[in-house]
Amino acid sequence: PLYKQNMKEEIAELKAPLGIYMVPGNHEYYGGISESAKFICGTQIHLLRDTVVTLKGGLQIIGRDDYINKRRKSLKELMSTCDRNKPTILLDHQPHHLSETQAEGINLQFSGHTHHGQVWPVSWITDKIFEQSHGYKKWGKSNIYVSSGLSLFGPPFRIGTQSDMAVFNITY
């Protein structure tokens, strides 16, 4: 979690004209979701937990709580508050049930969680567990991007996989 790595200085350097948005992941829960949320809310990051925000120009961002929270809202429920004629981005930490993304007409989904296995040959396992374990894929009318991320789980190294920080310039 960000609070355990004390990343306030790094976060303060981020610049985004329409804001910085984040959803919690499983490690925010493992490390203490209350402490994580408190830390994040003390930064410029907007923490989205089953929340929809509409930006200037109508772009909608849906932030889902993590899959580990069995009480999180369904994507269908979150989409019921959206204008389906406006572009929609979904932030969902774990890339599960991508067919729902397609069915609900999400334009773009960003996920992470997998670390793309972090250490070869675990990447083969993540490729089997997840419909999309890393990178970009078009699913019907939906675009899915799963980042390998910058951080690590367990040992502080990667073998046979790459860290990744993607920058998307989105116009609408």
Model features per residue range: what roles?
Residues 1-172:
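Soluble catalytic domains of enzymes that build or remodel membrane lipids, polysaccharides, and related
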